[in-house]
Each structure stands twice: as structure tokens, then as C-alpha cells.
Amino acid sequence: MGAYKYLEELQRKKQSDVMRFLYRVRCWEYRQKNVIHRASRPSRPDKARRLGYKAKQGFVIYRIRVRRGGRKRPVPKGATYGKPTNQGVNQLKYQKSLRSTAEERVGRRASNLRVLNSYWVNQDSTYKYFEVILVDPSHKAIRRDARYNWIVNPVHKHREARGLTSAGKKSRGINKGHLFNKTKAGRRHTWKKHNTLSLWRYRS
């Protein structure tokens, strides 16, 4: 068993005394720092490497905290101005994950970099903490690497804002495998298409 296998097993036993202590100490440390700050190295190297991180020039890790809880509808004092108030203001559930939100915020901060992926690192009662892997598209080490230079293409600018990262695809219902064709173009769209009786004038 290699070193990364051991690290993976440690992560699985989050309730062990050692890991609980480590999480508490790290959580305190992260709370003292800015909301978005650069990390010198990933706190979960095994996870970061599985998601594409390499300890070489051109790769950057940013750590971010996102407030937990639902998303309030952005209407001042609950004034919906013609929209039905009984559709709700407070107890709405945001359709995107907090990890996806974290990627978007880091992507806006470091707009010269490309978001590759992200992963959970910690949480407390108020916040969830994530680390986001970013790639510098103008760095020679990235541009010359055949495995990563696809991200240099301008079509991948702000991929996190368009739901093209792993976390973003999840909320869009995009995946591979059995029955995922049922979510193509959106779950509700597919349901509506299947449940709408269409009677064409000229039927074959």
C-alpha cells in the first residue's frame, strides 16, 4: 500500500480522535484567515492529485469558506412586486451545491487562472471550507504539458461559471451511464416532454 492509500484511509475515518482533533484545529485556523486565501499546498494531497493537481509550476491552490444554509430570494423586505409571495422567500433550497458556489467565487477573484476542480476540506456549524485547484494558462509549464494544455484554450475561460466543472455538472444532471438520458436538457424539461400530449395535424 502506497502513502496515498494511507492518507485516503485516514480521511475515511473522520470520527477518529486524531482526525476530529485535526479538523477542529484546522477549522480554527481557517476561520482566522480571509474568506478566500491562497494555500501554499493542498491539505489533502491524495484528493487533490486524484482531481488533477500536480506539485509543479502553474498549479495553484486557493482555500475558501462558504456560509452554510439555504439561499434567501434576493427581494428587499420580501417585496416581490407582482410575483406570487407564496412561492416563498426564505425557505428556498439552492439548486447548486456550496462547492459550486465556492468555485465561482474563487474564479471571480483569480480571473487570470482557470478552475480545474475542487474538494471539501472542513466544515463547522456556520461554514463549509473548500480548496479549489487552479491552473495558470499563460505559464510555460502548463502550455507545454500535453495532459493539461487543453485548459489553455480560450473556450475554457470561467468554466466554473458555466457549470462545466465536476461540481457544476452535478447540479445540471449531467453524467454518464444508465438512465442519465432522462436528465438530458434538464430534468423538468424531460418530464414535460414525456407528459405533454402532442397531436400533430398530419400524423404518420
From Swiss-Prot:
The gene is RPL15A. InterPro entries: Rbsml_eL15_core_dom_sf, Ribosomal_eL15, Ribosomal_eL15_CS, Ribosomal_uL23/eL15/eS24_sf. Keywords: Cytoplasm, Ribonucleoprotein, Ribosomal protein. Its main location: cytoplasm. The keyword Endoplasmic reticulum does not apply. One of its GO terms (molecular function) is structural constituent of ribosome. This is Large ribosomal subunit protein eL15. Belongs to the eukaryotic ribosomal protein eL15 family. It is found in: Cytoplasm. It comes from Candida albicans (strain SC5314 / ATCC MYA-2876) (Yeast). GO terms for cellular component: cytosolic large ribosomal subunit. It holds the Pfam family Ribosomal_L15e. One of its GO terms (biological process) is cytoplasmic translation. It comes from the Eukaryota. Component of the large ribosomal subunit. Mature ribosomes consist of a small (40S) and a large (60S) subunit. The 40S subunit contains about 32 different proteins and 1 molecule of RNA (18S). The 60S subunit contains 45 different proteins and 3 molecules of RNA (25S, 5.8S and 5S). SUPFAM superfamilies: Ribosomal proteins S24e, L23 and L15e. Transmembrane segments: none annotated. Component of the ribosome, a large ribonucleoprotein complex responsible for the synthesis of proteins in the cell. The small ribosomal subunit (SSU) binds messenger RNAs (mRNAs) and translates the encoded message by selecting cognate aminoacyl-transfer RNA (tRNA) molecules. The large subunit (LSU) contains the ribosomal catalytic site termed the peptidyl transferase center (PTC), which catalyzes the formation of peptide bonds, thereby polymerizing the amino acids delivered by tRNAs into a polypeptide chain. The keyword Cytoplasm applies.
